[in-house]
Amino acid sequence: MNTVGGDIEAGLALAELLSGMRKPTVSLVLGGGHSIGVPLAVSAKKSFIVPSATMTVHPVRMNGLVLGVPQTLSYFDKMQERIVRFVADNSSMKSERFRELMTATGELVMDVGTVLDGEAAVKEGLIDSLGGLSDALDCLYGMITKEKR
C-alpha cells in the first residue's frame, strides 16, 4: 500500500473487512501508510514495511462545516477510540502507546502526531516485520501452504 489516508469510515470499513477474512492476508507498506492507512496496514494477518516507508499517526481530523457543540467533540473522541482499539487489537502496539504517538507535539510542524519510518514502525510494534515485496509474497505463500495442510 501507498496512501496518504482518506475517509475514516471507508478506511475502517475496509480494515474490518480485511481483518475479518479467514483467508491468509499480508500487507506491505511502500512509500507511505499514513493516517487511515495505519489501520489498513495492520488489518492483515502479517504486515511488512520497507525501511524507507513512513507512517503518520495523528488524531482524527475533519474539514468542512463543524458544529461547535459538545456532541461534535464526543463524536471525534468516539471515532478516535475506534481507531485506537482497532490498531491495538490488530498489532503488537498497546493502545496507550498509540495514543501517545497520536497526540505527540514537537515532531510535526504546526501539527500533532508522529511520523514513523519502517524501522521505528516495527520497533514500536505497529508493523510485524521489515521487508519488501518478495518477503510479503513468501509469507503469503507460506500461509497458503500451511492452510492447505
Model feature map: region roles:
Residues 1-38, 42-149:
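N-terminal organellar transit peptides
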